[in-house]
Design a protein with these regions (language model features):
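Short, Lys/Arg-enriched N-terminal segments with co-localized hydrophobic residues
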Residues: 1-8, 29
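Bacterial N-terminal signal peptides that target proteins for export
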Residues: 9-19
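N-terminal secretory/targeting leader peptides
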Residues: 18, 22, 33-122, 139-142, ...
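Sec/Tat signal peptide C-region and signal peptidase I cleavage site
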Residues: 26-32
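Hinge/lid segment of periplasmic solute-binding proteins
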Residues: 127-143
Length: 344
């Protein structure tokens, strides 16, 4: 049997042990670091699912000491056009970036790959390594480290309209058209089409209320923004290759990041690139998406003619040169590097 004194001592030791355990848990929780990963793409986009897998792989490798948490659909309230402003300052630890959205602050970025100027997978694959190198160099100028890439499918861009089918550039001249990039505004304007940039998140309302009559958008992603609810007709206009999305981290943060964390992110990023840098099934996915839209009520019309398609491609190719010259700085040299990679 234990004496009263021994009982008291046992209780003291037990309480001390519990206290130390609790303190240890608190210190462990306090030392665990969470990186917020800003993703401006809707949660329903295929790329978002790929980013979720990337996050899962990083977290599994790190075992909880540092973890990533993905915030999709712009849920953190950070405009994607402001990425070069908020990311270097540490508003979030990590963010998805797309060069074509960043032309206001970095004009050279938006003219590296102008959509519509590269129309085949074979040609695009020649340019990808050069495009990645350019992005890494340019983002570094903004104190952002490029730590990963997400390939964008070879897309087929179509014209979705509210009230009547549009299958020619001539008919499009009588409509107000929603686009998403300045090069598109300039190209369509040169063809006599009234085009305006409307952000993806505002497109549904703009179509529903008649702010625009038609919207330029890939059929593959139309369901993610419920475009079939505000459109009755659609027709394919042109194929489109895009520079990849970039996963960015403040250069200062990345420099200070533990090598173990860097290695986990880099390895998962390489897996992400390998998974997404595949284009063989893109056209079939496009056809499947069109069939699904037809089931949901869209009338899918004949394609725009080859003549109209070439008219647009010629226009946007000229705009590419003009935008690069206007941007100045490294932009003309970037364009020349891409053209050289393409063999043009």
């Amino acid at each position: 049997m234990c004496s009263a004194g021994e009982n008291i001592m046992n209780k003291i030791f037990k309480n001390v042990a519990i206290g130390l355990t609790g303190a240890s848990l608190i210190m462990t929780a306090a030392s665990a670091e969470e990186w917020r990963f800003n993703n401006f793409l809707p949660e329903t986009r295929p790329e978002s699912a790929q980013l979720e897998q990337f996050v899962t792989e990083v977290n599994a490798a790190l075992g909880g000491e540092t973890s990533l948490k993905l915030y999709s659909g712009g849920s953190l309230g950070l405009p994607n056009t402001d990425t070069l402003r908020f990311l270097p300052k540490g508003a979030v630890e990590m963010s998805l970036m797309w060069a074509n959205y960043l032309g206001r602050d970095a004009p050279a970025l938006s003219s590296v790959v102008v959509q519509g100027t590269i129309g085949s997978i074979a040609e695009f694959e020649k340019a990808i390594p050069t495009v990645r190198d350019i992005y890494e160099e340019e983002f570094a100028e903004w104190d952002v480290a490029s730590v990963g890439y997400v390939a964008i499918p070879m897309l087929s861009v179509s014209v979705f309209c509210r009230e009547e089918p549009v299958r020619t550039i001539a008919d499009l001249k009588t409509k107000k058209l929603r686009v998403w990039a300045r090069d598109q505004v300039e190209a369509f304007t040169s063809l006599g089409v009234a085009a305006q940039i409307i952000p993806q998140e505002e497109m549904y309302v703009a179509m529903k209320t008649g702010v625009v009559d038609c919207a330029l958008y890939p059929a593959l992603y139309a369901h993610t923004v419920s475009l079939q609810e505000v459109s009755k007709y659609a027709s394919f206009l042109y194929p489109m290759a895009s520079g990849p999305y970039v996963i960015g981290v403040s250069a200062d943060r990345w420099e200070k990041t533990d090598d173990t964390v860097k290695a986990a992110i880099s390895e998962a990023a390489e897996d992400l690139w390998v998974r997404t840098n595949q284009y063989e099934a893109d056209y079939q996915r496009e056809l499947d998406a069109r069939d699904k839209l037809v089931e949901q009520g869209i009338v899918w019309g004949e394609d725009f003619s080859d003549e109209d398609r070439q008219m647009f491609v010629s226009s946007v190719t000229e705009i590419w040169a003009e935008l690069a010259e206007e941007a100045g700085g490294n932009a003309p040299a970037y364009r020349e590097r891409v053209l050289e990679a393409l063999g043009r």
